[in-house]
Amino acid sequence: MAEFVRAEVLGTKFEYTTRYVNPQPIGMGSFGLVCSAFDQITQQPVALKKIMKPFDSSSLAKRTYREIRLLKYLRHENLICMRDIFISPLEDIYIATELLGTDLGRLLSIKPLDSKFSQYFIYQILRGLKYIHSANVIHRDLKPTNILINENCDLKICDFGLARLQEPQMTGYVATRYYRAPEIMLTWQRYGVQVDVWSAGCILAEMLRGKPLFPGKDHVHQFHLITNILGNPPDAVIEKITSKNTVNFVKSLPSREPRDLSTVVPKDTDFDAIDLLKKMLVIDPDTRISAQDALRHPYLAPYHDPTDEPVASGPFDWSFDSADFPKETSKIMIYSEVLDYLNVDNPADPAPFDPSTPFDPSALEREFSEFLSDSGQT
């Protein structure tokens, strides 16, 4: 049986196995605390995420179970990789993942990114999304703080707690407001993987601009900001809205023509970057570009390699997600997943992403290392 050490971090009890030493707080969210620590077995730094009181409610237990299942199934260079999982004596769950130095949100809050980094990062985001979507998974909460980056320019998408199957009925409140797709705000009962592409488009715009494109103060203000730039929703979109009140709201909006997106980014922005942005930020999701097609866009030609943009081995099994389990049943299911992970030889971490297309990754890494140093992130 594993031995545990108990410490107090930011006023929170933090219990971890003796495999790990020197926990240091790096983040706190509504569902738990994240600390950096050193793994004495692998001799590598890790991020230890504490999920607090996962068995207190059926909804939290299901969210926890879903995240564990997804982390076990999704294996890709541009997705965060689970290294270990354990349940503490106080019945909190701890998930160890690889540790990356910073996140995109933190970087963007300090200084604008050089265009070459924006290009490389959106490529990796879309590469990860292509894989996620091929598994019939929608991330639903893509935002800069869920994009982790290290000093080698390696990028990984994290936080799959809100991820869902693409299905006929979907809940409306997902994604941080600035990055929320219009079909979610328009209370559609069905939406798909295109919501992640919209979020990625918002992230690309923010990298190019150095500030959010749609910084809405509330739900209504958010939609006004979108229509101020992209124009009124087309009839094809309005016809899919199921709420009469929402239809009335959309029809009451003043008539607005779409603006040229070149007016919302710096004057020296690459034409191809603007063109990709136009294809990602389309109000009608049925005509919005897919992650797979976006990878083929000329803007990403320096990195695009169809032989090294893998898809999942098959769709993720979502059969559990439609059922409502009692808390005790969910608890047994979570314990079973943890034991399964610990008792099965887990595949090695995906190799670091290294495009075979003709560019010099070492030069980009050196420049990014200097950028991080100048930003105080190293």
UniProtKB/Swiss-Prot annotation:
InterPro entries membership: Kinase-like_dom_sf (IPR011009), MAP_kinase (IPR050117), MAP_kinase_CS (IPR003527), Prot_kinase_dom (IPR000719), Protein_kinase_ATP_BS (IPR017441), Ser/Thr_kinase_AS (IPR008271)
Protein location: Nucleus
Highest taxon of source: Eukaryota
Essential cofactor(s): Mg(2+)
Pfam families linked: Pkinase (PF00069)
Listed EC numbers: 2.7.11.24
Record-annotated Protein kinase domain positions: 20-300
Keyword Coiled coil attached: no
UniProt main location, coarse: nucleus
Protein name: Mitogen-activated protein kinase mpkC
Species assigned in the record: Aspergillus fumigatus (strain CBS 144.89 / FGSC A1163 / CEA10) (Neosartorya fumigata)
Organism lineage: Eukaryota, Fungi, Dikarya, Ascomycota, Pezizomycotina
Encoding gene per record: mpkC
